[in-house]
């Protein structure tokens, strides 16, 4: 028997076993419906305690102290294990056991025996402690609140299919403690960032999710159609241009935490919809943003995890202290010590396209015909340096032709006052001193339109209203976007974005 045939046989047997269990549970539910008024789904049980709180408050008390207290509680949750008279009940704060003594089992024998793993029940009783020191509820009464018709995966074959974890996240969250904790951390990260920004006098705002003109980043947009207006609209790829309009309007410090949508491929680091925090700060430059980012990230790590040092894969990353800062040009040279062409490269050579194409091909970059010198430099960096940036690093010196919204450097107008922040071998944030010269922005938008006409479908559109806003005067401003999903990946030591997005994009099953 081949492995494929054997696997198919195992799957068929598992499916048959699952169908049998489902049929048995449906029969139990039918019997319950005939014997109660709530059609098998009562809604009058109210819990007054959570497992986690009970463990904190009573976990250290002795068996004798608990017996003397005779503290009666009402708990509710999902049955995760059933071992004779003991049930393990799980809810949002943790797990606790419930014990049905012989008297309870005698009175409620049929009802108790009908309970299955996965059922949701409510239990009332006094807190006790087992001989092993485990806290439990001595069941005085219980009520079946929801009959689970499908067994949990461990019951028949285990949740071993990684893709199924993402398709049926509800099952993954029931059986996988690591998954639950990842999303608890995510929630705490969002709260910590929001609180930090508010303490720095930033105002939280909301900008449109549907745009008439997509802008704020170089990416392919999702296109929809507005029936009433009979016009195409675009899901936003970034909120940047709207946020800067607010700075023009007089809100000097604004931030937004929300979704962006980009019609691009899937990868361990990319999902078509993702969460960003973008903020803009008048009368500041990109160097001040780097300082603020160091403070923000170390603060978030400390608040969420209790430490600025944490494992990531085989490495340990450190969010505390001062982060490394180097230009993209310096990073390429630093991480390619044995590449003769790169070591001989000067900043002036970057504008020699033939030379840059030669170097790019030598490091296995597949070059597109419409790429500019700046794009070639970025691709060489991404191929040879980015994966090696495990510790917090700011990369500066981004060329203007790949930074259409960033202010040009006063020292060399080929470059901009822009940085990207890397940690764990990936980009997590992008920031720069904003371009507030309306005429320069007009010229760069036109260059983007030309690039789009030449085949670059990620190039930006021309936004005339944004030019009008700049003509009213944008004060010197710095702005930044931080990828929440990638940050959470680092803080949870996970290596695919699907593990930190509750419902990631998936191809429909056949």
Swiss-Prot record:
What does the record say about how the cofactor binds? Binds 3 Mg(2+) ions per subunit.
**Assembly behavior:** Homodimer.
Q: Does the keyword Cell wall biogenesis/degradation apply?
A: no
Q: Which HAMAP family does the UniProt entry name for this protein?
A: Lys_tRNA_synth_class2
Residues recorded as binding Mg(2+) 1, renumbered to this chain, are 420, 427
Annotated GO biological processes are: lysyl-tRNA aminoacylation
Organism equals: Vibrio campbellii (strain ATCC BAA-1116)
This protein's GO CC annotations: cytosol
Record field: catalytic activity: tRNA(Lys) + L-lysine + ATP = L-lysyl-tRNA(Lys) + AMP + diphosphate
Cofactors (names): Mg(2+)
Protein name stated in the entry: Lysine--tRNA ligase
Give the EC number: 6.1.1.6
Where does this protein hold Mg(2+) 2?
427
What the entry lists under InterPro entries is as follows: Aa-tRNA-synt_II, aa-tRNA-synth_II, aa-tRNA-synth_II/BPL/LPL, Lys-tRNA-ligase_II, Lys-tRNA-ligase_II_N, Lys-tRNA-synth_II_C, NA-bd_OB-fold, NA-bd_OB_tRNA
Q: Which family does it belong to?
A: Belongs to the class-II aminoacyl-tRNA synthetase family.
Q: Where in the cell is it found?
A: Cytoplasm
Keywords linked to the UniProt accession: Aminoacyl-tRNA synthetase, ATP-binding, Cytoplasm, Ligase, Magnesium, Metal-binding, Nucleotide-binding, Protein biosynthesis
Name of the encoding gene:
lysS
GO terms of molecular function: ATP binding; lysine-tRNA ligase activity; magnesium ion binding; tRNA binding
Q: Which Pfam families match?
A: tRNA-synt_2 (PF00152), tRNA_anti-codon (PF01336)
